[in-house]
Design a protein with these regions (language model features):
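Acidic-residue sensor for enzyme active/binding pockets
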Residues: 6, 57, 87, 128, ...
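C-terminal segments
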Residues: 92-162
Length: 162
């Protein structure tokens, strides 16, 4: 699914509390986990993440997990590897949430909500034809109107513009 999570960035302050149960749940669901060196310490089943993993849109039961020091490191990682499709932050800190929304370059930026909402129907556009990550013309979920262009037909009797 094009709006599924590919990479999970976890703040180091919550890693010890959050990751053990999350990893167990994901392994039980058949997800293959790739992780940074810090993440690998949590479970021997975690495979070492490569540079390619951070930039891969798996479309499968695979997830890359990286532990980050702070929001700056998370933003830098996203700026380098993002598909520019959908990005999300889960936080109680609304100052960080606002900064995340302002600085992340993606068609849709979420705070405390699933990226699975990135869908033309969910956005009220009708049947979705595609998702654009470009900044010109349509960006985000697209339906038929976003794929059409205008043609103006002008007929006159010699009018001029003064």
């Amino acid at each position: 699914v094009c709006n599924a999570m590919e990479t999970l960035l976890v703040h180091e302050k919550v890693a010890d509390e959050f990751l053990p149960q999350m990893l167990e749940d994901y392994f039980n669901a058949g997800v293959t986990i790739f992780g940074c060196e810090q993440t690998q310490k949590f479970d021997s089943r975690i495979q070492a993440a490569t540079e390619e993993d951070w930039a891969t849109e798996y479309g499968d039961l695979r997830l890359s997990v990286k532990i980050v020091r702070d929001l700056d490191e998370a933003l830098a990682h996203i700026a380098r590897y993002s598909t520019r499709h959908s990005e999300c932050i889960v936080t109680r800190n609304m100052e960080n949430a606002r900064r995340f929304q302002a600085e992340v370059d993606a068609a849709v930026v979420y705070v405390n909500a699933s990226t699975r909402f990135t869908d033309g129907f969910e956005f009220g556009f009708g049947a979705e034809i595609g998702i654009s990550t470009q900044k010109l013309h349509a960006r985000g979920p697209m339906a038929l109107p976003e794929l059409t262009s205008y043609k103006y037909l002008v007929t006159g009797n010699g009018q001029i513009r003064g």
